[in-house]
Amino acid sequence: MHSIFSDGEFSPSELIEIAEKNEVSVLSLTDHDTFEGIPEFLQSAEETGITAFPGIEITVKFHDFNIHLLAYFKDYESLNPELKDRVKIMTDTREKRMCQLIERIDGVIPDRYRGTLKLENVKRAAEGVLARPHLAREMVRLGIVSSTGQAFERYLVKYN
């Protein structure tokens, strides 16, 4: 599952709550390129008795392909520090890409909205790792588009 720490709609605690209501007994959190939601996920799972598998979805470039690699951890607490450092670098790279995407979109949106898309606002909405759905929500909030689907159709797919 993905949480608000990447491109999901719910917090890690809310995911556990939804799983519990639907009688799910095992759940994994694998946000894109971040471990930020794992502590909350593990704590909430422990409180409900749901078996939790922490993980991460890492985007790996292989030749001209992006591959989404899922990694699961038996013991999150003893994770390799080098992996944590590498994930931090990936987060920083994701932020740079978001800045570039905002610049490209700012150049093609209607004139009255130019300059209104700000990285800080997208980051605040993201609560974690930046992803295109967070930018889409900010575009809806600003009135640039009427829905996140429209943001993707008109801008995010085309100018990514």
Q: Across the structure, where does each feature detected by a protein language model lie?
A:
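An N-terminally biased module of ancient metal coordination in phosphate/nucleic-acid-related enzymes
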Residues: 1-65
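Extended substrate/RNA-proximal surfaces in nucleic-acid metabolism proteins
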Residues: 46-160
